[in-house]
Amino acid sequence: MVPENRRKQLAIFVVVTYLLTFYCVYSATKTSVSFLQVTLKLNEGFNLMVLSIFILLNSTLLWQLLTKLLFGELRLIEHEHIFERLPFTIINTLFMSSLFHERYFFTVAFFGLLLLYLKVFHWILKDRLEALLQSINDSTTMKTLIFSRFSFNLVLLAVVDYQIITRCISSIYTNQKSDIESTSLYLIQVMEFTMLLIDLLNLFLQTCLNFWEFYRSQQSLSNENNHIVHGDPTDENTVESDQSQPVLNDDDDDDDDDRQFTGLEGKFMYEKAIDVFTRFLKTALHLSMLIPFRMPMMLLKDVVWDILALYQSGTSLWKIWRNNKQLDDTLVTVTVEQLQNSANDDNICIICMDELIHSPNQQTWKNKNKKPKRLPCGHILHLSCLKNWMERSQTCPICRLPVFDEKGNVVQTTFTSNSDITTQTTVTDSTGIATDQQGFANEVDLLPTRTTSPDIRIVPTQNIDTLAMRTRSTSTPSPTWYTFPLHKTGDNSVGSSRSAYEFLITNSDEKENGIPVKLTIENHEVNSLHGDGGEQIAKKIVIPDKFIQHI
C-alpha cells in the first residue's frame, strides 16, 4: 500500500503536470499562425520537457490501470522481480534508442515505452504461473485452470506481440526503398517483440507441462477412488456404521504402486529441455538479424550472452541425463532379504514417505521406477524419488554425502551390510557344547553408528540388545564398517557356562593405541512358574575403567 503522504504528493504532481501541459499547448497555439508552427514550438525548449513528462506520467498511469485490470494486486515477490530487472532493461533501451537519428525520437520513444511495459507484463505473468500452481487444492479442476485469468493473459499478450510484429513488418515493406534508416528501426523492434513471443512460448510449454502433471494426478486420484469398493455385510448383527466402511480390494501391491502418483518423473529435465529449445531460438534470431542485415554491433553482446546461456543450459541438461542413467545402471537394486538385513528397518523412502517394499514376497516391480536403490552411503530410496532429488542436489538427502565424484561418476560404495559379514568358525564353550558362531553373529546385530556430538561416552552397564535397538531408532548409519578380530580367552573353567572373547577397538587410521574390550556370554538356567526349565543368554561388553572417558 502507498502511504497517505505519498498519495498526496503524487496527486499534486499530476495536477501540476496537467496544468503546465495545458499552458504550453495554449501559449504555442496563441503565438502561432499554423499547425506546423505549433508543432515546432512544442518540440523545443521548456515545452518539450513538459510534454515528455506528460507522456511519461500518462503512460505510467495507463500501465498501472492495465496491471490492475489484468493481474489485480501484485504480490511482494512480483514487485521485487520488477525492480530487480527494470534498471538493466531501461539502460539497454536507452542505448538502443541512441543508435537512431533524432527525427525518429517520438517513434523510438513510443516503441521503447511499449516494449518496456510489455516486458513488465511478461515478468508478472511468469511469476503468476507459480502462484497458480500454489493455489491448486482439492476443489481445483482442469477446467478452472484452463479458463483462469492466467490463461487469458497468456493468450492476450501473445496476440498483442503478434500484432505488433506484423505491423512492424508491414512498415518495413512500405519504407524499404524510401527510408532505409527507418527499416533498421523496425527490424530491431521486430527482433525485440519476437523475443517476447519466444518467452511466451517458453511459458506456454511450461504451463502445458504443469497442467499435464495436474491431469495425471487427477487421473491417479480417480483410479484410486474407483478401486475402493464397499463390502457387503453378511452378519445380521453387523453395526450399520461398520457397513459403510470402505474395503480395499486385495490386489497386487504393484497395482497400488501404479495408481499412486507422486509427481511427474523427469519434470526438471523437461523444463531444462524447454529452456534449451527457447534459448536456441533466441540465439538463432539474433544471428539471423546481426549477419545478413548488418545490424548495429551493440547486438553482439546479446548474441554472446545467448550463446553462453545456451551452452550452460545444454551442459546442465546433458549432466542430468547422464546422472539419471548412472543411477539406474550403477546403483544396486535392493532385494527383500537385503532390506531386512540392512540398518534401514523402517522400510520407508524418506522422499515420498512410501514403503520401499510392500510385500515380503515381492521380487519384481511392474513400475521399474519404484525399485529401491542403495546409495554409496548405504541409504535406500526409490529410483524415481532419487532421480527427482538428484536433479536439484548431488548429495544424499539423509546424510548429505556426495553421490557423484568430480568426474561425474558415482562414487565407490563404502557400505557393507550385516548379511555380508558372517563368521563360519565353530567355538566350543566350557561345557563342551559346540556353538555355531554364524548363528551368534545373527543374534547380536552390531550396527555402525554416527554421532554428531564430540563427547562419546561408553556405558559399561548397558545391555547389548537395548543398545542395538536404540542405535536403530536414533542413529544414522555410517558409510564405513569396521570389523574387529575376536580372540577367545583361556580363563574359562570346565564347569562354567561363560565364554569370553577379547578384541581391540581402534580408530580408522590406527594412529592411536587400541582399547582392549572383552565380550562375555553367560548361560543362566531360568525356572518358570509352571516348572519348565529354560536357558537365558546374557551378553555383556566389559571395558576397563581407565578407558571410560571423553574420546
Swiss-Prot record:
Residues 517-551 are annotated as: Interaction with USA1. It is found in: Endoplasmic reticulum membrane. A zinc finger (RING-type) spans 349-400. It comes from the Eukaryota. GO terms for biological process: endoplasmic reticulum unfolded protein response; ERAD pathway; fungal-type cell wall organization; protein autoubiquitination; protein K48-linked ubiquitination; retrograde protein transport, ER to cytosol; ubiquitin-dependent protein catabolic process. One of its GO terms (molecular function) is identical protein binding. It is a multi-pass membrane protein. Residues 1-8, 72-84, 127-147, 209-271, 315-551 are cytoplasmic. One of its GO terms (cellular component) is Hrd1p ubiquitin ligase complex. Its EC number is 2.3.2.27. Its main location: endoplasmic reticulum. Disruption phenotype: Impaired degradation of proteins with misfolded intramembrane or lumenal domains. InterPro entries: HRD1_E3_ubiq-ligases, Znf_RING, Znf_RING/FYVE/PHD. Residues 31-43, 102-103, 170-183, 293-296 are lumenal. Pathway: Protein modification; protein ubiquitination. Present with 2660 molecules/cell in log phase SD medium. Monomer. Has also been shown to form homodimers. However, dimer assembly is likely to be non-physiological. Forms homooligomers in a USA1-dependent manner. However, can function as a monomer in ERAD-L so the role of USA1-dependent oligomerization remains unclear. Component of the HRD1 ubiquitin ligase complex which contains the E3 ligase HRD1, its cofactors HRD3, USA1 and DER1, substrate recruiting factor YOS9 and CDC48-binding protein UBX2. Within the complex, interacts directly with HRD3 and USA1 and indirectly with DER1. Belongs to the HRD1 family. This is ERAD-associated E3 ubiquitin-protein ligase HRD1. The gene is HRD1.
